[in-house]
Amino acid sequence: MSICKHGAPFVVQHENRYGSGASQSSLLSKSIHHISNSHEAINFISCYSANGSCFSNAQMLANASGSPVIGYYGKVNKLTASLANSGRIFRPQHKLAANICYVGNRLLSAP
């Protein structure tokens, strides 16, 4: 499954609203579960989705969805995302680590 969203470090656009990767990932996860209950990897085509490592938007989506997520460093589009080895895989974290990283993502997304 692929998801294409506008993104910036620690910020994602969803339904014409910008917010932290942490807050938007829970909304994205709910949308994903309406489509599929599969735990296949999610290809998160969003600029800067891998930036920030454990605080990244891709990690937030992995934690919210319970599925592995492929995120990208820097600017990305559908064409560059299809290149071999262009993304990084993020796996869901344990609850304590996920909560700490959630707070970190929210803090880093603040203006």
Where are the model-predicted features located?
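Active-site-proximal C-terminal subdomain of hydrolase catalytic domains
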Residues: A41-P111
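Catalytic-core segments of thiol-dependent peptidases
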Residues: M1-S53, C101-Y102, L107-A110
